[in-house]
């Protein structure tokens, strides 16, 4: 009855003495399975202790899978699982008939008399199932590596294998059950106490922007934040500013609290790492990007540039500019970075360039898979994830260009999965394209409006699951792609 041999060439080991191939046996413990099932049939309450981590597919024997599954179904209905109730459910099953099921169930009951701690048997069954899955993954990795198809690169195969192994390793960690309320209460009080000690009341990672921190209270672990805007609004520039500020602020906090330095991860699916770092250098050294690209720099500017370059090089700031990554690849690389570099916050530019895994022809379904995947990364790694997003062209057709939640591309699922949705909007961009002719009566009115929004970027917090929404005006220097706190100013109509 037991499946104790693998009849294929992939699982054959050589006997070193006789040089005779010996079929390898998959790891299993049929007796442990029998004794556990018998114990549960004797006392159904034992099921609650093992069902938190043990599923029917963890059993090696197909008949044991069916018996365990039947026990779960019977008890879910509020009935008692006994050999009699099981027999009525499985009587038409061919495998049950083949092994003379009634006698077999009686045998299980007899074997249960020797069980001392059934939970230990459940753990043995679970551990052996993990080992069998590990063998399956190993075979899959070998078979994929033998596949010489040019459609799948070796790098993709490695990431696929790494993801499979990580999922297998973390499977037991994700089997969460009810937690007594005292534990999360203690965690909440600890968080509140930390907030009370902070004069700025920022309990997450500071954005480096006072008014934005007052609205968001910093970036919080396990949150998914969406930063959306139309082209030329400054999405990437703003994300770079936030990433650099977060990197510096995490470092200071880690040093103060005597903790391991956390790092920033930045997936740049659109721009190359060179383009991204050129923007960083322009922002920090306050040298326009045209001068940097053309190399037209005086000695003073060049020295300033070298100084900022040296400072930036020391930061725990990591960029991955691989194009068209799948959500699975992003998850794998983020996990690796968390493990190797203590990832503290993750930025992704931008959401619509990520590929789904299921290859759905429905783009809304694919975006749903991606946003759910990003939220899962935030929760699993316990970090904030900030993903940039495009907005629908419908914005340009309205008189009022301020974005709304309904303007998100494939909006329903993005809005639903995000903890915070922010829009970046610069009225200056639109006004400069509506300048009346010089001498026109409306020119003075236009100039007055432009003065009031000059160098201002509005960050519109449209959704905030745990806080207020509203508008946060910031200073924006388009020459250096630099954001800062906005000083309160008065404007003259002259």
Curated annotation (Swiss-Prot):
GO cellular component terms, semicolon-separated: cytosol; primosome complex
Organism ancestry: Bacteria, Pseudomonadati, Pseudomonadota, Alphaproteobacteria, Rickettsiales
Similarity section: Belongs to the helicase family. DnaB subfamily.
Stored Gene3D superfamilies: DNAb Helicase, Chain A, P-loop containing nucleotide triphosphate hydrolases
Its EC number(s): 5.6.2.3
DNA-binding in keyword set: yes
The name this protein goes by in its record: Replicative DNA helicase DnaB
Entry-linked NCBIfam families: DnaB, PRK09165.1
Catalytic activities: Couples ATP hydrolysis with the unwinding of duplex DNA at the replication fork by translocating in the 5'-3' direction. This creates two antiparallel DNA single strands (ssDNA). The leading ssDNA polymer is the template for DNA polymerase III holoenzyme which synthesizes a continuous strand; ATP + H2O = ADP + phosphate + H(+)
One Pfam family linked to the record: DnaB_C
SUPFAM superfamilies: N-terminal domain of DnaB helicase, P-loop containing nucleoside triphosphate hydrolases
MF (Gene Ontology): ATP binding; ATP hydrolysis activity; DNA binding; DNA helicase activity
Provenance organism: Rickettsia felis (strain ATCC VR-1525 / URRWXCal2) (Rickettsia azadi)
UniProt entry keywords in alphabetical sequence: ATP-binding, DNA replication, DNA-binding, Helicase, Hydrolase, Isomerase, Nucleotide-binding, Primosome
Gene Ontology BP terms: DNA replication, synthesis of primer
Residues bound to ATP: 229-236
InterPro entries attached to this UniProt entry: DNA_heli_DnaB-like_N_sf, DNA_helicase_DnaB, DNA_helicase_DnaB-like_C, DNA_helicase_DnaB-like_N, DNA_helicase_N/primase_C, P-loop_NTPase
Residues covered by the SF4 helicase domain: 198-490
Record field: transmembrane: none
Physiological role: The main replicative DNA helicase, it participates in initiation and elongation during chromosome replication. Travels ahead of the DNA replisome, separating dsDNA into templates for DNA synthesis. A processive ATP-dependent 5'-3' DNA helicase it has DNA-dependent ATPase activity.
Quaternary structure (record): Homohexamer.
């Amino acid at each position: 009855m037991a499946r104790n041999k693998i009849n294929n060439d992939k699982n054959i080991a050589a006997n070193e003495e006789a040089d005779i191939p010996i079929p390898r046996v998959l790891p299993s413990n049929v007796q442990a399975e029998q004794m556990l099932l018998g114990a549960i049939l004797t006392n159904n309450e034992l099921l609650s202790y093992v069902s938190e981590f043990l599923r029917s597919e963890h059993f090696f024997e197909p008949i044991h899978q069916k018996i365990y599954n039947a026990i779960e179904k019977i008890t879910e209905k509020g009935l008692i699982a006994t050999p009699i109730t099981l027999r009525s459910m499985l009587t038409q099953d061919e495998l049950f008939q083949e092994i003379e099921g009634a006698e077999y169930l009686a045998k299980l009951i007899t074997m249960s008399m020797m069980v001392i701690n059934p939970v230990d048997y459940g753990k043995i069954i679970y551990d052996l199932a993990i080992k069998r899955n590990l063998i399956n993954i190993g075979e899959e990795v070998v078979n994929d590596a033998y596949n010489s198809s040019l459609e799948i690169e070796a790098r993709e195969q490695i990431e696929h294998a790494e993801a499979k192994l990580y999922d297998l390793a973390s499977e037991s960690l994700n089997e969460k059950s009810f937690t007594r309320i005292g534990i999360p209460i203690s965690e909440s009080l600890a968080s509140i106490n930390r907030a009370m000690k902070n004069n700025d009341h920022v309990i997450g990672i500071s954005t480096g922007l006072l008014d934005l921190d007052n609205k968001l209270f910093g970036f919080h672990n396990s949150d998914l934040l969406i930063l959306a805007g139309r082209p030329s609004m400054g999405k990437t520039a703003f994300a770079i500013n936030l990433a650099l500020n977060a990197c510096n602020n995490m470092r200071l906090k880690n040093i103060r609290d005597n903790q391991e330095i956390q790092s920033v991860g930045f997936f740049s699916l659109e721009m190359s790492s060179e383009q991204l770092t050129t923007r960083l250098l322009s922002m920090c050294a306050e040298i326009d990007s045209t001068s940097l690209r053309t190399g037209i720099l005086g000695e003073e500017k060049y020295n300033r540039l070298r100084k900022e370059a040296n400072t930036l090089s020391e930061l725990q700031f990591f960029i991955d500019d691989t194009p068209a990554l799948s959500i699975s690849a992003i998850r794998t690389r983020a996990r690796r970075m968390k493990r190797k570099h203590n990832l503290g916050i993750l930025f992704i530019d931008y959401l619509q360039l990520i590929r789904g895994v299921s290859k759905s022809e429905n783009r809304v379904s694919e975006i749903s898979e991606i946003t759910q995947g990003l939220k899962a990364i935030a929760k699993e790694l316990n970090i904030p994830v900030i993903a940039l997003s495009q907005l629908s062209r419908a914005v340009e057709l309205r008189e009022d260009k301020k974005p709304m939640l309904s303007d998100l591309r494939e909006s329903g699922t993005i809005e639903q999965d995000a903890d915070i949705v922010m829009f970046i909007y610069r009225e200056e961009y639109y006004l400069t394209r509506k300048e009346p002719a010089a001498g026109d009566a409306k020119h003075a009115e236009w100039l007055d409006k432009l003065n009031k929004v000059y160098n201002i970027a509005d960050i519109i917090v449209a959704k905030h699951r745990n806080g207020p929404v509203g508008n946060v005006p910031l200073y924006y220097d388009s020459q250096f792609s630099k954001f800062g706190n906005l000083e309160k100013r008065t404007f003259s109509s002259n």
